[in-house]
């Protein structure tokens, strides 16, 4: 990359970032937080945050990168995708109606508490089973890729560890105080550190716990944007340190700075992977929607499907094995746009942008239902569901459409099943006479008593 080529790329980069940041800032000023703001920030992080790191690696350390024309193609396609996404998200499909509708879901106090207890039980039980089978893998494995080897049993259980976070989200949304907010951080980070040591380097639960803590703080006004930036910088350094421990690296001096640059870029902003796909575009055999179906294979136990393929050819594995010819045992993230390119080439990019806009719109709709519901237990469940799905939005932007679809379906099924079991348990307890009603009076004593004072409303709560 020459200085002239860098200058051209920088102009395109600057225009793209200003365009997306302007739209995101206007949305933030309007609502402070919604899933469009979240997706936009994650999108900026994935496709634009890594550009300065790439430039420093090129000019400071002489690292070879993808030819400039493909870097430019990656940047332009990312900007075009966001423009189509934004139009899709903002397009109103039907008129707003003020007519109240009958609630499709009702949740009481007992059901809400049973739901988070079941979610937490799933997470703790699967962590315990994984630990009994494998011990502390962080101190046993010589390399991170060994996690996916046959020596480690019960790898599929890792997908259940995450449900500890939605459980703690329900607890927080039932109270929504600063103390509950801080307890959410302490509990989820402690659990994340435990899973990091047991699994041998998986940082996802830690990243999500910290990110959700920040998002909640922004929503409630407990932290400012400057505090968010400072926390983000702290998070980047923390993730770098955990990455060093994960890969067993001991670095110092210039090499430490070099390692920080490429690990941070690859962790938070694998945008060069999209450029690699454009470079190898003529070698790609479009997979259609097959990667989405294949990604569900990992959720099917081998005892139920004895002939289940051990190697799943989703978009990440196709990119790693077929495009990069990399068989190290780790799957390299193709990003959201990369997965669309693998599935259907250029034509899938606008179609994917429209679909993603509708998905984000749906999450915002559910989130608004939760915020505005008068039943605080139902509101807690709906908001915890939405915030719990943040991990799936991260998967969407970083890993791709196929990984997102399988994970969001899995998340909805487990979360919905816990709520259904909670309702069933409540019905059984109530039928057995173990649920007693607690009467709470909402006292609103007028300053001057009058004969026409309306009696205090009585609200029933289940214990």
Swiss-Prot record:
Asked whether the UniProt record includes Membrane among its keywords, one would answer yes
Keyword annotations for this protein, in alphabetical order, are: Cell inner membrane, Cell membrane, Membrane, Transmembrane, Transmembrane helix
* The keyword Cell membrane is annotated on this UniProt entry: yes
Q: What is its main location?
A: membrane
Question: One Pfam match, by short name?
Answer: WzyE
Residue ranges annotated as transmembrane are: 6-26, 39-59, 65-85, 112-132, 154-174, 180-200, 201-221, 222-242, 340-360, 377-397, 408-428
Among the GO biological process terms of this entry, one is: enterobacterial common antigen biosynthetic process
Q: How does the UniProt record describe the way this protein sits in the membrane?
A: Multi-pass membrane protein
Quaternary structure and interacting proteins, as annotated:
Probably part of a complex composed of WzxE, WzyE and WzzE.
Protein's UniProt name: Probable ECA polymerase
Organism classification: Bacteria, Pseudomonadati, Pseudomonadota, Gammaproteobacteria, Enterobacterales
